[in-house]
Amino acid sequence: MQLIKRIILFVYVVMLLVLAAATFIEYFHGTSAAACIYHHVFFIAGWGILALLTLWILYRLRMWKRMSVFLLHSSFVVILAGALITFLTGTTGDIHLRIGTSTFQFVEHETNLVQTLPFRVELDTFRVEHYPDTEIPSDYVSSVRCTSFADSSSIQTDISMNNVLDWQGYRLYQSSYDDDWGGSWLGVNYDPWGTTVTYLGYLILGISMMAFMFKKRNVVYILLLGITLLIAYLYQMNAQKSPLLPVLSSPLLGVHVSFIMVAYTLLGIISLNGVIGLFLSRKEEKLMAISRFLLYPAVVFLGIGIFVGAVWASISWGRYWAWDPKEVWALITFMVYGLAFHSKSFPSFSCPRFFHIYMIVAILTVVMTYLGVNHLLGGMHSYG
């Protein structure tokens, strides 16, 4: 058993290092270079090893007797299974249409080959909507008509930011537009099974996290959850009064940002508590207990924020994960802090001094996610 745990820890750390390195490789050598890492057989095998060994540990320890813990770890396996299905069976591409033209083909991203759709897409109109009394775009809208080859059925609908067309297993989403506003670029995503399995994993994860927190029956956790939801509501109400980028005009914005920011705040407090713990050696155990108390909601909220963001990405861009640098560093942060819960498997986390030092170092992943990506690595999330 100890050997298996050491193998898991080794692979886990290697995957963290590879994820971090990939973001810098993307910065220096471009997205295609990073994609070579994310699609490499050894990268996929690393996740597979972690998933299989996790299942083996769950079986050997009969974790189903602790249902919330069992569901929590099982959800990660389901999410990884969904990601594998997406990788093996999914495809993405682009369609370019001028107003009044139609096509039944798209150019696949990975191979640049022309692929065929089971229906024809015609662009009736394209328009850019603006906020009242301003020239600031509020949305990009493509009015399209789709006609099926199988039964000649057709639909007419608008595709815009945060409004994806889902038809016959394909998802079409607003990607870009021509400078003269006479044409539109639509993204194409075909992934009927991978997304479904991944969403199932998200659902299991959410249920297990909530069960884990409420199982503690701690009023502070419940208050934190309530305060976070209130912040999300107020954030969304304020956002509706201010011009936003079209992609940000989503009700999920407030939930995503609020949970992430509350999580970062709690992790910052834990880091500060760690510094105090190193100087006050007589109280280091008590301070460690406080940090552990705060770590539960911090990681739970971070997980909720990440996966709400993934759902939002699926609605906005047609895909739930794009290996954007901020996504990757948020995942790294989640994994780094998640490791600290496993003190029974890794006894070092039971040592107050080690725990405090770990929490101090771990905050660097938060700093990198929140500031480093925006000011150094860039990516889709670098709005600031």
Regions found by a protein language model. Give the residues of each.
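Solvent-exposed, non-transmembrane regions of integral membrane proteins
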Residues: 1-384
